[in-house]
Amino acid sequence: MNLGQDYNAIFSKIRDFEANAIGQIGEEFLKSVLNAIDEVINDGIIHDEYDIMTKSGVSFEVKTAQKGRTNNTFQFNGINPRYNYDFLICLGVREDKLLYRIFKKDEINYIHKERKYFMKQNEFKKQLVPMNPDNQVNYKLTLNIKELEEITNLIKELERVLGLD
């Protein structure tokens, strides 16, 4: 617990939550946003390959992380490049605001020569790093605050990716 610390910022209580709880919060948040613009058709059903499916047939994998304690980065864990989803949404929670970035599934590229996965989006390129040396299934992606968008743009971008704009 962070006793004696300031809890005045809008999301400050999140610092006391475990990673799984933060992930569930992010998923529920995205479901509520998607329900406002499209319909989530399998709310509450656990899937192996995606977290959310909309009525329009678009699937989302949601990863939520809080800002690191000593630097301005977020580590999004448990990304499986082989899973079957249309979009990966990374939600970054700071104590004072929410940030995000949306990636198309086909922006995850395996570079055989380097034997590594990369997230490539226009000029942006970041390596997906194995969660641990023996795990070649789940990866992590570290993003800087500057590589994420303000949450105020999320609905417009979701409408665009869903073809509703």
What are these regions (language model features)?
Residues M1-K55, K63-D165:
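Nucleic-acid endonuclease domains
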